[in-house]
Amino acid sequence: KWRSMRSNGVPETYITGDKPAYDKFDKWDESLQYAMRNPLYHWTHLELSRIFGIDKVLNPSTAREIYDECTAKLQTPEFRAQAIMERMNVEVVCTTDDPIDDLKYHTQIRQSSLKTKVLPAWRPDKAMAIENVDTYNEYLTKLEAAADMSILNFKNLIDALQKRHDFFASQGCRLSDHGILTFYAEPYTDAEIEAIFLKACL
């Protein structure tokens, strides 16, 4: 949905920004009119019909009514996330989690009566984001705490990530989700990788 909105020139403040919820919804319904024959168009109406029992077509003239009806239903116990998942027979949901995440909510969910499995997925993007040295070093400090070890070189980084990966696996993680924007095709030696890492850690 966000990609579709961006493609239609919707300002980011209406997508991930701080605009009011209805204003964001309204921008979505405006963008949806350009998604005819795109799965997004059909998925949106399937969601409205199957989950909310709303069979109206979402467009600028119906947006407010549909928004208000959905909002009212979402305030009821029958429309809590867990209730919807059970009603829709959802067997597994995977969340996107950083290696430093403690996954405490996954433990709570496992101990609850929810039949749907909620499993973590490994997303280590920040462990590779060396472009901003200050932000990267702040992240390494958090990773050190999560892995309970010092990160003084590249091997330490890999070892810390392995420890966290093992922990994630113990919590049911079987998937990874990577947001790598650029794949660097140049071959690097171990010494070059170490030098780059240490330069980022200065």
Where are these regions (language model features)?
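Metal-cofactor-binding active-site regions of metalloenzymes
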Residues: 1-202
